[in-house]
């Protein structure tokens, strides 16, 4: 596939010193002086509004956006693209963090995109602060200054938060960060705490300025106010507090009362695609191509009434895994199949379709193969021609987070009511009830009538979240302790960045020392560079089947 890239250069003019590492000269001699580049108010406002596109593409458009789904076994793929085959094959191997790896970019792009958004937001905030000296407004008026500042803070919050979701550590960069002083990496939990503190302030500021309008092209959503942005910030806080956990124990220790509160005050987020720079690779490719949108049986199988899924799972041994073969399920879930046709074949379901064929290469692992296409996003990718809503936060995500809070509080009645919003309305399945029993977080996902509420909840959370926000299925399974053994529970700082920082390379995953850093490629050069963020926005072009490899 050919990708046309629009480039803008953003620079953090600073010197960052890290503990145990060389000082880094981060000035960019090829970039314009910051004070001149951001001297005009309209340039600053344009820079700030562009930050969400940078965040969006880092989350939804980079090739790496496919990897969380296949590591979570919601989607399945043995194609090499973006490193999917290596990250999803069994037995799981450690993530390849060598900068020389063919697909290193898939692990690097989210990191650089999110820090690029942070960089631009911080530059914009600094320019506004400088322009306000003497008590004057820098942009058109005080309201414009307030809107731009709150929006930039929102971007810094959700960008720091995504780094904490995916990587083991990072730099906590805020409006107050002073680059003349030493800055060190912080672990993911500390990074997330900082991100949430920013978003909590955004929520407060949005409440105080709720009536201020937000231009449509800032978030690609029409008729939005800062009051609405505050609700979206609530959604992110709920998602982040639940999703940051690396283990079952950490997720259990989360503040579920707070998660419930934020989720109940949250709102969905679905920017409008424009068929140009505003697009989502995961929702496009899987909606238009049967070779990309394959459903893993670990996602759909819990709804199988036959013994097929149990037989497919087997005893979980390497030999059993290698012998797994695609099969047709028997299910009442309307999301997976519609009524049988005249020939007794399953028809298109709400989200999926039984193609009665596999499309993945058998020699790369029969266990990857599936008959089921998960083409839930065909409305965006085909019917609407990439110009419809691109869903990131659904109401179902917010409802189901509240359901998990209820389960953890042993409130089966409330949990059942929330689970049924999708189980019954979308799946046309028998309603869950308090009498099913709360069960335990260790219960395997199970959509069948005999399953516990925890089992039914897990099934709903995975199928409803699949191919919406790319990371939620991965963070859910990670926090429930349900990832396949050896799956990386997070990524290391990208190997390319480790070279720059003169830090030893490391990685996560594999069959030994699960969840602890392993070894990877070593430093290859002196690690110095200009620390300018070169943001490339990718323009969508038609998918070419020949791109699969």
How should each PLM-predicted stretch be described?
Residues 211-217, 430-447, 513-523:
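Surface-exposed intrinsically disordered loops and tails
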Residues 41-42, 84-398, 408-414, 450-452, ...:
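Structured, solvent-exposed acidic/aromatic patches
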Residues 414-429:
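Active/binding-pocket-proximal capping segment
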Residues 4, 60-66, 461-479:
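Bilobed periplasmic-binding protein-like "clamshell/Venus-flytrap" ligand-binding domains
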Residues 1-19:
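Sec-dependent bacterial lipoprotein signal peptides
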Residues 403:
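Active-site-proximal region of nucleotide-activated glycan assembly enzymes
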Residues 21-78, 451, 481, 485-549:
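Membrane-proximal, proline-rich intrinsically disordered regions
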């Amino acid at each position: 596939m050919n990708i046309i890239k629009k480039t803008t250069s953003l620079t953090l003019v600073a010197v960052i010193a890290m503990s145990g590492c060389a000082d880094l000269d981060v000035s960019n001699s090829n970039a314009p002086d910051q004070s001149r580049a951001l001297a005009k108010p309209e340039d600053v406002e344009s820079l700030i509004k562009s930050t969400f596109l940078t965040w969006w593409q880092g989350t939804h458009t980079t090739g790496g956006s496919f990897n969380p789904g296949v590591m979570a076994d919601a989607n399945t793929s043995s194609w090499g693209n973006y490193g999917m085959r290596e990250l999803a094959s069994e037995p799981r191997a450690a993530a390849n963090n060598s900068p020389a790896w063919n697909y290193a970019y898939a692990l690097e792009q989210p990191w650089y995109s999110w820090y690029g958004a942070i960089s631009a937001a911080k530059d914009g905030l600094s320019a506004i602060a400088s322009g306000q000296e003497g008590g004057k407004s820098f942009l058109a008026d005080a309201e414009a200054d307030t809107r731009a500042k709150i929006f930039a803070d929102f971007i810094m919050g959700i960008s720091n938060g995504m780094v904490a979701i995916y990587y083991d550590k990072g730099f906590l960069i805020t409006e107050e960060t002073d680059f003349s002083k030493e800055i060190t990496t912080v672990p993911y939990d500390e990074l997330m705490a900082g991100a949430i503190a920013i978003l909590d302030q955004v929520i407060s500021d949005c409440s105080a300025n709720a009536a201020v309008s937000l231009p449509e092209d800032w978030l690609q959503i029409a008729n939005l106010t800062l009051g609405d942005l505050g609700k979206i910030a609530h959604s992110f806080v709920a998602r982040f507090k639940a999703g940051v956990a690396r283990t079952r124990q950490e997720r259990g220790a989360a503040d579920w009362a707070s998660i419930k509160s934020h989720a109940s005050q949250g709102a969905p987020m679905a920017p409008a695609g424009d068929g140009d720079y505003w697009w989502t690779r995961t929702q496009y490719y899987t909606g238009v191509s049967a070779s990309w949108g394959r459903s893993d049986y670990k996602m759909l199988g819990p709804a199988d009434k036959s013994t097929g899924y149990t037989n497919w799972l087997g005893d979980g041994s390497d030999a059993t895994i290698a012998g797994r073969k695609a099969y047709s399920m028997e299910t009442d879930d309307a999301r997976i199949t519609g009524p049988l046709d005249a020939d007794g074949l399953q028809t298109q379901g709400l989200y999926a379709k039984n193609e009665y064929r596999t499309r993945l290469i058998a020699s790369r692992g029969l266990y990857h193969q599936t008959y089921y296409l998960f083409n839930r996003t065909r409305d965006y990718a085909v019917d609407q021609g990439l110009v419809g809503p691109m869903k990131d936060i659904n109401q179902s995500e917010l409802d189901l987070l509240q359901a998990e809070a209820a389960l953890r509080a042993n409130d089966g009645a409330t949990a059942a009511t929330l689970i049924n919003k999708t189980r019954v309305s979308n799946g046309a399945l028998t309603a869950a009830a308090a009498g099913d029993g709360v069960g335990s977080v260790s219960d395997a996902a199970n959509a069948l009538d005999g399953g516990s509420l925890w089992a039914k909840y897990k099934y709903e959370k995975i199928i409803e979240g699949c191919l919406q926000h790319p990371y939620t299925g991965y963070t859910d399974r990670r926090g429930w302790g349900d990832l396949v053994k050896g799956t990386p529970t997070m990524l290391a700082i990208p190997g390319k960045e480790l070279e720059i920082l003169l830090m030893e390379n490391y990685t996560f995953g594999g069959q030994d020392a699960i969840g602890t850093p392993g070894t990877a490629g070593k430093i290859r050069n002196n690690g110095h560079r200009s620390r300018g963020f070169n943001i490339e926005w990718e323009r969508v072009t038609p998918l070419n089947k020949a791109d699969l490899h």
